[in-house]
Amino acid sequence: MFRLQLFLFLILLIPNLHSDSFSIMNLNAQNLFDTLDDEGKDDKAFLPLKSKESFDHINSCHNINVKAWRMECLYLDWNEETKEAKLANLVKNIISYQGNGADIIALQEIENENILEQLFSLLKPYGYIDFVLLEGTDKRGIDTAFISRFQMNNPQLHYVNFSPEFEKKDTRPILEVSILFNEQNIRIYNVHFPSNFNDLQMRIESFNLLKELHISHSDASIALGDFNLNSKDDKRESVYKNQEDQWFVAHREGCQSCNGSYYYGYGKSWDFLDTIFVSRGRGIAFDKDSINVLKTDFNTYKDSGKPHRFDPKTKKGVSDHFPMVARINLN
């Protein structure tokens, strides 16, 4: 009986190669760092306290203008226990989707391949076989990444060539991989567009690059990630609507009762900073009923319904973003 139960469990974890659909998840992990000082990257807040005692470290923290970030740099104890709790909570969040996680996971705010591999090792028992992260030039050292039950091929980064007034600003590239599903090549783009501290035009130019990448080939494509587009800007400029000549946009196709993936405290608004795009007319489409914002009792504040960001002191919470999930059909 035990062997039969184990066999059935393993079958659930392995993607059905003859299926006509697969699931996908986007999750901004909110500062998934290891405990080591990654040379050349600004990871000084995410170190153990014992590594924060030097004059140089303390002085560099005092140069941070935002008080909350300055206090984090000085006093956050990002030790092994804290890191392991963060990883465990992320795994719990990921596998809460249908009991074993989505077939493909797109992640943002991952420091490096070292911490990604640690997360992958914890997810490997659930049938995941591959992970990808390519180091970008973001000064904070946070990158986009994938973990997948499918082999991923041809990983590459695409940088935005911004207008002259923005070209000196730091940005993150678009990460592209390909999978072969039912003998069909599918390209997947993972994005983390410039934050709302930057001009909206930088995000619009990032959307334009994504569109250029999409029309440069005829493969079925998915784009997902943290687009950093708040509802105020989207309403004023119709940014998501303007993508619909090329893409189906998840929260405009389904998830009608969803508030958003992120609560923007400054504007006091729910926003779909995170969403999923599926290419039009290229043989794939959303299962519209599957589109959802993944909320659980441990990733949500009970009183407000907002995302429960990870608290290093209590070791509770996951991220300040909710995951976005959907099932993709071949048609």
Role assignments for model-derived ranges:
Residues 1-19:
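Classical Sec-dependent N-terminal signal peptides that target proteins to the secretory pathway
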Residues 17-122, 136, 310, 331:
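N-terminal, active-site-proximal structural segment of metallo-dependent hydrolase catalytic domains
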Residues 23, 212-222, 229-331:
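Metal-dependent phosphoester-hydrolase catalytic domains
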Residues 24-29, 73-79, 83, 90, ...:
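Active-site beta-strand/loop signature of hydrolases that rely on acidic residues for catalysis
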Residues 41-43, 105, 131-133, 163-164, ...:
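Extracytoplasmic, non-cytosolic globular domains
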Residues 73-83, 101-107, 133-134, 163-165, ...:
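Second-shell loop/turn segments in exported
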Residues 104-106, 110-185:
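Structured beta-strand-rich core segments of catalytic domains in phosphoester-bond hydrolases
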